[in-house]
Amino acid sequence: KDEVYNWKNTKYAIFRNTWDYFEKFEEFNNWIIKTKTKTKFINCIELVKWNTDKKYLKFLSDKGINVSKTEFINKKSSISLSDLFKKTQFDQAIIKPCISGAAKDTYRLNKSNFHRFEKTFNSLLKKNDMIFQEFLSNITIFGEISLIFIGKQFTHAVKKIAKKGDFRVQDDHGGTVEVYNPVKEEIEFAKLCVSKCPSQPIYARVDLIY
């Protein structure tokens, strides 16, 4: 953040290190609105804003992309975790805000222990739209694959692995990263995901979990 910098001096701006945008989302959104008339964002501003809210998963699902089974809960809803487990029949689940990152306020729970998280869930729900998502246990065994595209071209991939005893693959939580060589089917699926975005990104990352 630099209030002094004149963005009219910049022809293009790439979103590179906005790791905490979700903690200051209103401020971030206001900056976007103010700055979009002074420079050109890469990716386009409409796509950036679309991608900040994990409701994009429903958009992709409606386009035929296979995504993790997910329930979206509106802020200030009275629904409980008990209700959600009954509705979905998930054995394990993840809860997190729709606008979030780096696994902040992300919790893993199951049918036996969800009662311990009701208070936390209700507290988060007062301020956020929330996700209730089926937990895919393979992430603790195999990890999460990220495929990177520049334009429409696949460039490289990595595998993110959670530390032992955790499910969060981010390095903030002890996760590690290694080079990954995806098979053709993984690349093609990731390309399909990118093609379904509301507009075509100049750069993109697609995360895969088995």
Regions from the language model: what does each represent?
Residues 64-93:
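Rossmann-like NAD(P)H-binding beta-loop-alpha module
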Residues 14-16, 94, 131:
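Structural motif
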Residues 46-48, 73-78, 98-102, 112-114, ...:
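Short acidic/polar capping segments at secondary-structure boundaries
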Residues 3-9, 80-88, 121:
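Short amphipathic alpha-helix with an adjacent loop that forms part of the alpha/beta core around
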Residues 1-75:
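Conserved N-proximal alpha/beta basic substrate-recognition cap immediately N-terminal to
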Residues 104-194, 198:
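Phosphate-binding site of ATP-dependent enzymes
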Residues 2-4, 134-138, 207-209:
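Short, solvent-exposed loop/turn elements at beta->coil junctions and helix N-caps
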Residues 198-210:
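Conserved metal-phosphate-binding beta-hairpin within the catalytic cores
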